[in-house]
Amino acid sequence: MKRTYQPSKLVRKRRHGFRARTQTVGGRKVLAARRSKGRKRLSA
């Protein structure tokens, strides 16, 4: 059986990266929440 996690840096950046987050309203909310919480890393 194929495992669910097949690492790829490109896909990781495209799906969960900073620029991907800023492009949608929900993503911007995620960034805002992580900023207010004081997260060291905002996105992948």
Swiss-Prot record:
Feature: compositional bias, Basic residues: 10-19, 31-44
Superkingdom of the source species: Bacteria
Record has Ribonucleoprotein as a keyword: yes
Example of a GO MF term: structural constituent of ribosome
GO BP field: translation
A GO cellular component annotation in the UniProt record: ribonucleoprotein complex
Stretches for region Disordered: 1-44
Keyword terms, alphabetized: Ribonucleoprotein, Ribosomal protein
Any matching Pfam family: Ribosomal_L34
Family statement drawn from the similarity comment of this UniProt entry: Belongs to the bacterial ribosomal protein bL34 family.
PANTHER family per UniProt: LARGE RIBOSOMAL SUBUNIT PROTEIN BL34M, MITOCHONDRIAL RIBOSOMAL PROTEIN 34 FAMILY MEMBER
Protein name as annotated: Large ribosomal subunit protein bL34
Organism (species): Parvibaculum lavamentivorans (strain DS-1 / DSM 13023 / NCIMB 13966)
